């Protein structure tokens, strides 16, 4: 591998722009369909777009701030000395593959990926498990670096530090490289988007792309007639299953009667009373229009409906 660019004093916008030039570790799981928070459809649009999306949130901020601490704990647990990479790296054999490493391990052909984990997600790290999209990220780093192994140190808030060692598997890396290069060649280069996969992140991406409707335009969807039929079939099945599910819940309620809680092998059931206050918006609009307008926000969205014409 080679250093593509130093990240010391590199503005974040420039760093994000460099990442558009190839496939990075965080792209790998999305391209493989393993990332629950990001999809191949989103990766594609990020790569072809000139827009630099500087997305940040509290979880990402904490992950950055605690990276030093996780690396320090890893060194304490293992005795390995680590150092910052301070660069975007590029595979010399497969130049499309780029990587930002959290840490490199001194004196070894190995690296370290630092993670912070909510205790609510601790089960995903139990019994030696690693979330699939993180494993794909590490395999990508192994493909770029040519190293022998990679470590993942995951700090589960308030509980423990979990350390895993991932050893290079040449067949796994070969398959990953093939998938990543196929994605780039078949989609990014010809600018042909991959099909969305039904995840919420793809819905958000599509809604963002087409925020405003054209009331004077009607699209011909004849080519999608088969898909629309399939959707209708699925809708009918879901409706039937929802009714069956509700009928079971009704039987459970009849058995519970006035009991707030119920138990069965492997299940805990609750049926408890609660009270809530809701604003009568219609009355407020009528009797206090100034106050209603003062605390009202205009929200723009496109409502999507499909009606089956028998």
Predicted regions and their residues:
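Accessory terminal regions of nucleic-acid processing enzymes
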Residues: 1-310
